[in-house]
Structures are given as structure tokens and as C-alpha cells.
Amino acid sequence: MKILGIETSCDETGVAIYDEEKGLIANQLYTQIALHADYGGVVPELASRDHIRKTAPLIKAALEEANLTASDIDGIAYTSGPGLVGALLVGATIARSLAYAWNVPAIGVHHMEGHLLAPMLDDNSPHFPFVALLVSGGHTQLVRVDGVGKYEVIGESIDDAAGEAFDKTAKLLGLDYPGGAALSRLAEKGTPNRFTFPRPMTDRAGLDFSFSGLKTFAANTVNQAIKNEGELIEQTKADIAYAFQDAVVDTLAIKCKRALKETGYKRLVIAGGVSANKKLRETLAHLMQNLGGEVFYPQPQFCTDNGAMIAYTGFLRLKQGQHSDLAIDVKPRWAMAELPAI
């Protein structure tokens, strides 16, 4: 069974092909970073138009990479939510049209389920059950995972996602878009303990997160530094970046430890764009070593949005006979609890 996967939920156009016997046999990705850089963030209309231009050529490139033709494809998976509605519609329309033309089934895939299952693309993949930390620009969730489609969100951000807080704080520091990765690189030059940021919602019971206060704290710290120094010098920027990242990572680690204790699980999966963060990986690896458990991450190329995770997730569901109807339907907001189990 060979499944074509299409990802167009935000600012990456991803196309991949997953083979039941060989695994991932094609992976094509185009990023719109340069397109949105001048605006300091994703412009939905521009994102949609660029997906229109890039999706079909990437499908052709993926087929060529795998040395396949359209007749070799057994099904099509596409991201149907959550995400930007216009961007989602581009991928859904192309996927449904091809499925009709090629006479194969198609299925809409939940974007965050794709991220959650991305570590399964690795040879050293986690076994169920496990706790998953989904951490990206749009989501920060702790999920109890007992199988494919057997998800319970046990904690989530009540305001900003961790990735969003990274990007907004990076903007305060004058860093280029995309800011999260730039902030992490800058933090490596920072001085520990010069600034201390709070660890929000760690002093109370529960597994929910809140990162909007950290953004405000960062803004106040920047303003005070400018007042004291006359301008924001590079070392001060690095020191603020270090303190901010340390607070976010520490907060995530504290909540992960609680979630593992509550569930009794010994496996932790970290997925989503922020899972590529070096400091986060090191901290959670140390945590799981101390707890006698295991931690799993996607390969770096599968941390950000990609077609491979959509192709794989679609394969799992199509193999069980699940598929979407002919309607081109997308869900900009979509709870994982609504997904059927396999």
C-alpha cells in the first residue's frame, strides 16, 4: 500500500509517499519563510496562494523521487485541520481532485495527530502507551496516548502556545522571522542567572500551561534593560533569551514529570516544531533518565510541518478502511478527542 501525503496547513508545503513495505520513499518540502519574513509572520492570503503554486510540482517531484506513477498510488492523505482555512482548502481540493481522478480513497488527517505520530517514522519508535507533549507555534498540549486515535488531552495552554511565546519574545529582541529558532541560537550565548523568569502555573496543581505572562515579563525586562543601558546591547539580548528559554523549558519539564506520575507511564514523546529545541531535548532526556523511562523525538526534519507525517498517519487509517467522503471539508479548529480510534 502506497500513500501520498499532502501538508498545507500553514507556511510549509509538504508532499511525501509512504510505502507499507519500504517505509518513507519520498519526501518533498517547500518552506515559505522567505515569503513571510518581511511581514514578521505568516500572511494567510500569501500562504494560500503559494500553496497553489507549489503543491502540484511537489507531487510530481515526489513521484519522480520514488520512481512511481499515479497508477502506483493506493490512497491520498491530506491535512484537513487544524490550520489556516485557505491553506487547508488548497491541499484538500488538490487531494480530493486527485483521488477522484485516480480512483483511490482519500482521508483528511488531523495535523497534530500527524505530529504526534511522527516519531513512528524512526526505526527506534515508541510503543503504546505513552505521554505526548505536543509543542508548536499553535499548540501546547499534554496527551495521554493509549493507541492510534485513543487520545486524552490532560493538559494544554490556556492562552499562548509555547512556540508563539518564543516567536513573540524573539520579536521583542529584534530577531528575524522565524524568531523561535533564532532565539534558541542566541540563548546559547547567554549568561545564566543574570535574569530570572517565572515558571507559570507550576506552583499549583494541574497540567495546564500559560505562557502569555512570560511574554509580558520579557517585554518588561527588555524595557528595563533599555532604561538602564540606554539601548539593548547584544549580550543583554542573549541573557534575556537564555532566561526566557530556561523558563519555558523548565515549565514544560515540570508538567511532563507530573503527567508521567499521574498516568504511571514510562515513555514520553515530544513532537511539534518546538521539539527541535536543543535545550528542551537535553532537559527532557535528563528527566527521563532520572525517572528510569524513555523519551522519543521525531527526526529533526520531521519536527516542523511535513508531508511524511501526514502520509504515515493517513496510511494507518486508510489501512483500517477509514476514509473521508467526497466533500471538500476542512476544520480550522479540530479537537483530537473527536478522532476515531483504530
Swiss-Prot record:
It is found in: Cytoplasm. It is an enzyme of class 2 (transferase). Fe cation binds at residues 111, 115, 305. Its EC number is 2.3.1.234. The keyword Ligase does not apply. Gene3D superfamilies: 3.30.420.40. Keywords: Acyltransferase, Cytoplasm, Iron, Metal-binding, Transferase, tRNA processing. Substrate binds at residues 134-138, 167, 180, 277. Its cofactor is Fe(2+). PROSITE patterns: GLYCOPROTEASE. It comes from the Bacteria. Belongs to the KAE1 / TsaD family. Required for the formation of a threonylcarbamoyl group on adenosine at position 37 (t(6)A37) in tRNAs that read codons beginning with adenine. Is involved in the transfer of the threonylcarbamoyl moiety of threonylcarbamoyl-AMP (TC-AMP) to the N6 group of A37, together with TsaE and TsaB. TsaD likely plays a direct catalytic role in this reaction. This is tRNA N6-adenosine threonylcarbamoyltransferase.
